[in-house]
Swiss-Prot record:
The record marks 162 as: Transition state stabilizer. GO terms for molecular function: aminobutyraldehyde dehydrogenase (NAD+) activity; betaine-aldehyde dehydrogenase (NAD+) activity. The gene is BADH4. The active site is at residues 260, 294. Belongs to the aldehyde dehydrogenase family. Keywords: Chloroplast, NAD, Oxidoreductase, Plastid, Transit peptide. This is Betaine aldehyde dehydrogenase, chloroplastic.
Length: 501
């Protein structure tokens, strides 16, 4: 059952603050097309306030309140946040489903992962204490050297709408664990749960300014945040086009960035698979999260000897997916996030048709849903490598398909993309899977599955899918500066390079 969406302001310096220009943006429920609330629209003036608050949080009490405090001290806050989110799991899941159209069961799993991510980085914060002053072996006995890991400073975090709170947490949790202070700018298409994260931070007593949350449009809030001279690093998840702009802005100040961008990931199906198991993983890999996954395995490569039988089986699986209001029991496919995204997805499908491709199933609005931005799970065959549907990211429930005859051809087709986020290979021959895994030009490979993601494992891409790694121990390293400290251990002996005066 839907719930009321709370009305919030911007979260700056531990307080709710009205945007300086007092503007707000309507929230549209993508399953009903109705306005269910609004969010504050931050601008450059609000960014100034938030960045200043974050800088003060770093310096307060000479850093002892946060940046220079022990990892164990910060871990207590992260665990408190995790506990509070777990306590409010149903509330957060319902808000997520209303805001972005995610099936309620999926949203609930996401909230579990949010709490788990804060718990994991609480552990990482504590582990950071033990890693401080790690000794470095030197070839000279008269010197001792060790390494300090210190927070990089104020970080700007820009997160997407497909996993609104979870992808924000992928950035917030490690940044706070490292001792950074942060300004989070979630997507204006799905900001509600990020604002509720602010309320959780207020409830657990997170020091003012450690986490500031600004909602608003990209050009008006995200742009000023990315290029702000007092922001020491930017982490961005979103489209490749926007990521390029973020990188350009940061480059003017030689500011480090982490980018997780678009994808057009392949799933390679060999002739020895169990057809039903492979069909379900293929559907899940492309249609989970309503097809709006940066790593969606949306290019299906299937061995020519089983292609006809496999596609027939896959179509049956896809037609059996329950498409409904996200709150309906058993929903497995909800609407895409917005009207513009809905129109974009349908345009991709119509362009594929006009270029000569065949729609095996789906391709339009489900007949039983007259309102909402719903698109049927769509499978497109007779695709050439020059077609738009093969080359460009759709970000919707659309799968395109080609066949291959050999392992080498499969690898060539799989790597035929500007992107390199993820890939899947399905075969009972694990030696073959290992060969394919090594040859794929991506940041993550799934063997005999597609899309499982764990907080403990690194996440990121190659090529135009970005660079840097989130999650795992790599996630916290994103927000740390490494400082070498070398000490002369000789007693009163001079260095001896210059002649004594």
């Amino acid at each position: 059952m839907a719930i009321r969406v709370p009305s919030r302001q911007l979260f700056i310096d531990g307080e709710w603050r009205e945007p300086i220009k007092k503007n707000r943006i309507p929230i549209i429920n993508p399953s009903t097309e109705e306005i269910i609330g609004d969010i504050p629209a931050a601008t450059a003036e609000d960014v100034e306030l938030a960045v200043a608050a974050a800088r003060r949080a770093l310096k307060r009490n000479k850093g002892e309140d946060w940046a220079s405090a022990s990892g164990a001290h910060r871990a207590k806050y992260l665990r408190a946040i995790a506990a509070k989110i777990t306590e409010k799991k149903d509330y957060f899941a319902k808000l997520e489903a209303m805001d972005c159209g995610k099936p309620l069961d999926e949203a609930a799993r996401d909230i579990d992962d949010v709490a788990g991510c804060f718990e994991y980085y609480a552990d990482q914060a504590e582990a950071l204490d033990a890693k401080q002053k790690a000794p470095i072996a030197l070839p000279m006995d008269t010197f001792k050297c060790h390494v300090l890991k210190q927070p990089i400073g104020v970080v700007g975090l820009i997160s997407p709408w497909n996993y609104p709170l979870l992808m924000a947490t992928w950035k917030v949790a490690p940044a706070l664990a490292a001792g950074c202070s942060a300004v989070l700018k979630p997507s204006e298409l799905a900001s509600v749960t990020c604002l509720e994260l602010a309320e959780v931070c207020r409830e657990v007593g997170l020091p003012p300014g450690v986490l500031n949350i600004l909602t608003g449009l990209g050009p008006e809030a995200g742009g000023p945040l990315a290029c702000h001279p007092d922001v020491d690093k930017v982490a961005f998840t979103g489209s490749t086009a926007t990521g390029s702009k973020v990188m350009s802005s940061a480059a003017q100040l030689v500011k480090p960035v982490t980018l997780e961008l678009g994808g057009k990931s392949p799933i390679v199906i060999f002739e020895d698979v169990d057809l039903d198991k492979a069909a379900e993983w293929t559907a899940f890999g492309c249609f989970w999260t309503n097809g709006q996954i940066c790593s969606a395995t949306s290019r299906l490569l299937v061995h020519e000897s089983i292609a006809a039988e496999f596609l027939d089986r896959l179509v049956k699986w896809c037609k059996n997916i329950k498409i409904s209001d996200p709150f309906e029991e058993g929903c497995r496919l909800g609407p895409v996030v917005s009207k513009s995204q809905y129109e974009k997805v349908l345009k991709f499908i119509s362009t594929a048709k006009s270029e000569g491709a065949t729609i095996l199933c789906g391709g339009s609005r489900p007949e039983h849903l007259k309102k909402g931005y719903y698109v049927e799970p769509t499978i497109i065959s007779d695709v050439s490598t020059s077609m738009q549907i093969w080359r460009e990211e759709v970000f919707g429930p659309v799968l395109c398909q080609k066949t291959f005859g050999s392992e080498d051809e499969a690898i060539e087709l799989a790597n035929d993309t500007q992107y390199g986020l993820g890939a899947a290979v399905l075969s009972k021959d694990l030696d073959r899977c290992e060969r394919i895994t090594k040859a794929l030009e991506v940041g993550a490979v799934w063997v005999n599955c597609s899309q499982p993601c764990f907080t403990q494992a690194p996440w990121g891409g190659t090529k135009r899918s970005g660079f840097g790694r989130e999650l795992g121990e790599w996630g916290i390293e994103n927000y740390l500066n490494i400082k070498q400290v070398t000490r002369d251990t000789s007693t009163d002996e001079p260095w001896g390079w210059y002649k004594s005066p």
